[in-house]
Amino acid sequence: MIKNKKVAFVCAIHQSEAHRPNGFELFNDYLESIYTSCKYPFKLFGFDNESDDKFEVENLLDNLVITRVDDQYKGGCTYTWNEGIKMAIKEDYDAVIITSDDQIYDETVNDFIDTILTHEHKDNAIFGPLSNNPNNDYQRAYQPNGKIWEISGKPTEELNGFCLAMTRESIQHNYFDSAGNFFNTGKEYIWGKQDVEVQQRVEHSIVVGTCYVYHIKQGGWREIRAGLRR
């Protein structure tokens, strides 16, 4: 664990009776996994992306912020990612991990953070863990393998967008625009392209095989929006 470093998690949340009735249950399980596993000082920036019901927390913790987005046509997941990154940068977090509510973390998340903060390319790199459901072969695994390696980041060989992490310096070196957006602000009819596009700007794409994330991959909420496909 690297001393005097703090981490921000950015998480998109969605619940709907038609497409994702268990959305809040997923998020509760996600929260439990982060709060029981992460040893670094952290803050979780959650975005309730136009859920049918409003996510409410009794006795809200100081390091948990939930922002309600009333219209996900405003930009979908990408909007929440960008807004969460802006909040994290404003509050001087050293690393930012982009996630969604259908993921479960264990203590290997600390190895993930160690690598993000100490890797030789940390000032211009984007990082991703291993997972059971990464939509590619090079991140697919069912446990950590202890290896850390670079991939090209080009289309068909990029980190999957389910979990992407960067240092503050990498974000500041690779903004998409002057408004402080890190990801392409295009509408999500190009869903699946934002995570590809950003890796064309960031110089290095790194697979962190010391970390494993269980990805439930329940993205049915995307069907709400016409033309939205991953």
Question: Residue locations for each model-derived region?
Answer:
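Hydrophobic targeting segments
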Residues: 5-11, 34, 43-46
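A conserved acidic beta->alpha catalytic loop
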Residues: 18-19, 47-57, 104
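C-terminal catalytic/acceptor-binding lobe
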Residues: 23, 180-230
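Short, acidic, metal-binding catalytic loop of nucleotide-sugar glycosyltransferases
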Residues: 24-42
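Short beta-strand/loop segment that forms part of the nucleotide-sugar
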Residues: 41-51, 67-71
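Glycine-rich, basic loop-to-helix element that forms the pyrophosphate-binding segment
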Residues: 71-88
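Short beta-strand-to-loop acidic/aromatic patch adjacent to the donor-nucleotide binding site
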Residues: 93-104
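Conserved catalytic core of nucleotide-sugar-dependent glycosyltransferases
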Residues: 106-182
